[in-house]
């Protein structure tokens, strides 16, 4: 099975490691977001920062989620700067972001003492299948 958005993801990860080599640990998250966004743009991708995405319930907008970076309107990037980066709470929250949005791929990027990342995916086909079965369906998908 081919990875979703494999080439874009590979380029984003290259940018991530480029930024992580240059910027030291301990800066405010916004520095990493801005540097990463600039690096990804230089690779000729469309980048949106601090993107608000509508969340729906029964065809009504009930709120918005704020994503650090969206690349090519296809991939969510969440930036972190913590010591305990890959913990279950962050992963579960990220899965919810994928479930509630039309995006299928999310990269958790940690600019901690050691650069680390996690790639999560949830296909829209799977989301639709779950909705049609009524399994966990809560009407939150647009």
Can you annotate each of these PLM segments?
Residues 25-76, 114-125, 133-140:
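Active-site metal-binding core of divalent-cation-utilizing nuclease and nuclease-like domains
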């Amino acid at each position: 099975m081919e990875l979703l958005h494999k080439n874009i993801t590979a380029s984003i990860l290259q940018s991530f490691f480029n930024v992580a080599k240059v910027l030291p640990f301990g800066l405010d998250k916004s520095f990493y977001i801005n540097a990463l966004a600039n690096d990804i743009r230089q690779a000729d991708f469309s980048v949106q920062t601090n993107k608000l995405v509508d969340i729906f319930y029964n065809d009504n907008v009930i709120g918005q989620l704020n994503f650090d970076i969206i690349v090519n309107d296809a991939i969510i990037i969440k930036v972190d700067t913590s010591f305990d980066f890959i913990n279950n709470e962050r992963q579960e929250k990220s899965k919810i972001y994928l479930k509630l949005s039309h995006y299928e791929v999310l990269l958790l990027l940690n600019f901690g003492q050691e650069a680390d990342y996690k790639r999560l995916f949830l296909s829209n086909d799977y989301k639709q299948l779950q909705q049609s079965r009524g399994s966990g369906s809560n009407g939150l998908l647009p």
